[in-house]
Amino acid sequence: DAARDAGGLLDWGDHEARTLEDMGYPNWVAEKGLCPGLPDWTALKNPDCAANFVTPDSGGKGRWLEGPQSWHQDLMPQRLEALGLDDLWMVKFAGGADALWAELEAAEKEGRGTIIFNWTPNFTDGAGFTFIDFPPFYDGCRPEDGGDGACGSPDGYLKKAVNENFPNTHPQAAAIFKKMSFTTSHIGAMASLVDIDGMTHEDAAAAWLADNESVWKAFID
């Protein structure tokens, strides 16, 4: 909004995909029955659930693997305490995104549960990932805003924008971009081709276009 209001950019609509950054789990956690009741956050109150997420560094508690502490400071430890989950769960801070992805692979190989910080859309949407349903976010629910932190994260939009001159200099491209709208599964599949299958961006784009002709043709008709 600030960039648009400063001038030079035009709001060109939103993608269908919504954005979210929060704690969740790979779908195989639910498929293995490691925490019955998920994605409802109250399932985390069950000691038998927490026991399936214990790691050598978690002191006997179930572990949430957060991103680096610089990302959100103590947001997740505060949430655990506010929801009354800190007797059963603890937060470990990862060194970066690569550590989060390595944890997904390690946990599946070891057959143990894992709850990690993640965001959508990204490649994990293609593999299958579910965010925990925490109490809804509302303005003022976080500690820095006067709340107790017993709330999840807000979802958001995935915005499109163009240079203010673009519709005049490239009217056909501008019209196509205006109609373009990707879903979470579309973007997850694209990202998976690069992050999981190891394709170059160019090869991934070609593969996705070949497999999704009905999607992109709707943008150019």
Residue locations for each model-derived region?
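Surface-exposed patches in mature extracellular/periplasmic domains of secreted proteins
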Residues: 11-12, 53-57, 88-94, 189-193, ...
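C-terminal lobe and pocket-closing loops
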Residues: 121-181
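Soluble non-cytosolic domains of exported or imported proteins
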Residues: 35-38, 70-74, 94-98, 167-171, ...
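A conserved helix-loop-strand patch within extracytoplasmic ligand-binding domains
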Residues: 2-65
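Ligand-binding pocket segment of bilobal, Venus flytrap-like solute-binding proteins
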Residues: 60-138, 143
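A bilobed periplasmic-binding-protein/Venus flytrap-type ligand-binding module shared by bacterial periplasmic
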Residues: 21-34, 155-169, 192-193
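A residue-level marker of the well-folded mature domains of exported/periplasmic proteins
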Residues: 15, 34-42, 47-50, 57-58, ...
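C-terminal functional modules
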Residues: 174-221
